[in-house]
Amino acid sequence: MIDYQEELEQYKERIDELAKEKRYAELRDLFLPMEPADIALLLEEGKQEQMPLLYRLLPKETAAEVFVELEPESQEMLINGFSNTELTEVLDELYLDDAVDIVEEMPASVVIRILDKATPEMRKSINEILKYPEDSAGSIMNMEFLSLKKDMTVEDAFKRIRRIGGELETINILYVTDPTRHLLGVLSVRDLLLAEEDDLIEEIMDPDVVWAKTTDDKEDVAQALSKYDFLAMPIVDLEKRLVGIVTVDDAMDVIEEETTEDFEKMAAMLPSDKPYLRTGVFAVSYTHLTLPTT
């Protein structure tokens, strides 16, 4: 991460210099080793008229990760300048929960264009999630997860992971469901690695699953993730069918949002003749989050 304002200014000056001289290959190389959050910061802090050009220099996968880190105003500005092909490429690289977050922040005209260029599967999923109340677990869940059947072998499970795992945001935690999608158990990739290839999933899964409902408060779910040290929390509908997961990243976003609101309320209550909190820096860190195994 970029730690110092001085370093940030040096990067901004270098970017401005290279952009003016149209040394685009060097600009691209400058961004390559950076984290998406740092690139987004540089784009936000730099000259607005340069942002579309600089963004287009990024590799496709990096561009999508940077896009998620940008402020909604910058996202909207870029979308308005995207060709249909460029918009489709960005959407293809986004995880579903990130796409939902973006849609929720955009004006109606931009939302219509996003949904028009999204795949039918993403469009359906976005519309499904947007039906849930804003403060519910359903509104922040990710509908892209990896499920297994209890009569699969460990070898079968690994084949399934290799086949579809690359398209998912997380494959560290796996869920076991019956043919009607009712949640039966949970296990980690570590469990699979330590098992024999011919072991059945039913034999190594943990049937005692901690889950939440789509209607549960999202802050309660975020706190539960922290309490149980989970990487993800399975989310079920009213018929107890598995419909999504809330990851630790989603939980961190919720906790940061709630903390920001709390600080703003505190600041509003302070007398006007005293200093008040103008900016909050939140460091919510989750380390070594693993699912307890039996």
What name fits each language-model region?
Residues M1-L270:
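Hydrophobic packing positions in regular secondary-structure scaffolds
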Residues E264-Y286:
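Cytosolic-side membrane-insertion boundary helix
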Residues T287-T293:
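Conserved small/polar residues in nucleotide/adenosyl-binding loops
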